[in-house]
Amino acid sequence: VKIEAGTRKDATMGKAILEELEAVVGEGNVAAAPEEAGGGFLKAGSKNPEWIRVAPGTTEQVQAIVNLARENKIGILTCTNRYALAEDLCRRGILIDFARLNKVERVDTRNLVAHVERGVTWKRLKAALKPLGVKTYAPVAANSSSVVETIVARAVGKGITKFPDYPLMNMKVVLADGDVLKTGTHGFNEAAADGRNEGGPNLSQWHVGADDIFGVVTRASIMLWPVCEARSCLVYGFEEIDEVLKALKEIPRTELGVEYVAINRASLQRLLGGAGDGFPAWSLVVGFEGRQKLVSHNEDRAGRLLEKYDGSRKDSLVPAMTEQLDETWMEASDNHTAFFARFPRVIELDEKVQEAAEAARVGRADVGKILVSVDRGRAVYAVYDWFCEEDCAAALESLNLSLVDLGAFFDRPHGSLGRKIYTGIPNHLPVLRRIKGFLDPENVLNPGRILREEDKAWDPPKVPEGEIGLTVSNLKEVVGKLRACVGEPWVSDNPVDLISHGRDFTVFSGERPNVVILPESTEQVQQIMRIAYEHGIPVVPQTTGFNHGGLTISRKGGILVDLRRMDRVCTVDDEAMTVTVSPAVRMRYVWWEAVKYKATEGVHLKPILPLTLGSVSLLSNYVARGAPGTAAKHGNATEVTVKMTWVLPNGEVFEVGPGAIPGIGNLPIQYCPGPEINGMFFNADGQFGICTELTTKLYPEYDNVVELEELLTGSCLEPDGHKAFCKIVDATYDVARENITEFMYKGHPGAFALGVASKMEGISIKDALNMSPRHPLALMVSGFDAEEIAIKKEILKEILEKHTMYIIDPS
């Protein structure tokens, strides 16, 4: 039964339903009267919807509510923003109010994670964290007073300049069948770890940004940050937006500072109060935190860089803005919009917003603007508020539709904006519909949200009747079709050729495939997939000796798609600091191409590479969810990949990432609009298709990196191996909290010996091994100048000494 809330005659919500709901949540926690059902979720002047509002106090009660709704063919509605979506006001259903689900279950100050229920507000969480010496991230424009709703919605934090990933680890989700899904490593053991990634594909990431269409989130585990010794900021005033944008783009690429937030006069006046006459047109706030000595150094160097722009210091604003850096900023008005954009497009987009405001009779002085530098100056997050009494929803809807055409990326679009964006991405809605179909087959959860009745599901390939599989005659026909597809020289079923494709980088012997084919384009891969399904032949992709995920050759023969000819794409975008590669482009080649490009003056670009061979395909390693050596600073491949092109099993092409939206361009944001479906393709062992192109982030590195980067090794004299290991673990925790290292690696004696022997004449590997510590801790630091490196080394030395460790000096 398909349930479309507000349209079905049999979706009854009578007295019996009210009594059953009260039996679940208790008397007084169900509201059915029209004037009460909307609770605080309606804007002033909104009509009263036909809802039953129910307030559960536990996840188990949410399960019971979902089961009750499904059994009675009633839709479940949730409000993931401050106000209900306009499209939900005309729907009938049970609205879940999470206000009573408000426990801060646990705060883990060692691992910097808080486990909070959905009803916990920002105010409540801040009060709970304050005595513990930790804090949460600070949103620029929170969509909800609920911490969980804000973070699961990927709301942008002020610190997105340095910390571009959203601070979400795990979720507890009530599915449409009433079962509870615990995402990430919580699916195995909540107490052991709070890892975001599952053992295989990141299927549970579907619930991020999904606004509860696949499941109802009731709890989240969120990242925390330590409260540092020093917190400060610089404030510079500017009169022109173009000069502000230069500073927002260029200075973050030096990696000095945490936040880069530009606020116009109208928004600053609303934030701080007062007349605002003394405020500049734009105030650029650059935030710093850490050890006092390091903060003072970085503040001084960033201040020197800011002097070259046409602005002036506004020291009188520093105390107030330093305090504001860690405050939660809500959406500042009911007339609000926000989006990501590439730097070259911001001025045109800003002018469009201004024109629309004037057309809606909103004065120039009443248009609030906030611009945030994203991930070291790759892009901008732009926030706009029209400070007026009138409801400008229609004008903003029209504005947003026009902004998409100019390159604005809205990551959680709804209504007409959502339809324009989702229908513009080939195969996006069919994939979403397919996921919805098996997670919520009866369409109970937020029916009509994102997906509509007319949206077609992804069509799985069908194997026709007749001879299929690994038979002699069938394979002969397949080989003929494959040769017609890519050319005779690039297809072989010769045993001599197949032997070399029967081994891989694992302990398994592998089996020879029946056919090897070497395509050179995405279009040819599409044809191969269609031929394979037409004849019922398994397909396995391979690149540079490493398969996409499983690192194993098919055990049953089939078609091995060798992608080594697809090695022609290696395109660097220095504006967005990204590189786009095809499957066979090797890591060492990406490095040499990237370093040719500048991030800013004195700074070039570099890829972040995993600890593997330079001859390995970058695409294959990233798709296999490889971890770079600098994962402590930059994250894993899932956090740095911004676009992928996949050939699905039915031969259709599916692009994931903002760049898949027509007109957006190469926007380096690591997630799709709406539900985060890109996670399912990572570490999936090729189950969902073949990746033919991938775009990933590059990172800034100083040109004189040899002088401004140093690798240190820490160890201890503790003779007991286990106690020594525990000291290393404790020291690693403390070092990580400082956010000052490029690289942290608890190595082994062999790795240390190889490093020493390669750098010191007259020392053999055997000699180096004899003097190696049992648990070496490799730490790499870099900096703006030699003074910054010296400060960081001093901090590391202090931490290691605290744990009775020392820095090894091989000389």
What are these regions (language model features)?
Residues 235-240, 286-292, 339-345, 382-389, ...:
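Short beta-strand-to-loop capping motifs
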Residues 3-13, 19, 27, 48-51, ...:
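Conserved glycine-rich FAD pyrophosphate-binding loop
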Residues 17-20, 244-270, 346-363, 392-400, ...:
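Short amphipathic alpha-helix segments
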Residues 260-264, 268-319, 742-775, 780, ...:
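Terminal amphipathic helices with adjacent charged low-complexity linkers/tails
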Residues 41-134, 146, 150-156, 502-600, ...:
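Long, structured ligand/cofactor-binding scaffold of large enzymes
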Residues 105-107, 118, 123-247, 251-253, ...:
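FAD-binding subdomain of flavoenzyme oxidoreductases
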Residues 30-34, 55-56, 76-80, 96-98, ...:
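General beta-strand structural signal in soluble alpha/beta enzymes
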Residues 61-64, 124, 241-246, 292-300, ...:
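Short, conserved charged micro-motifs
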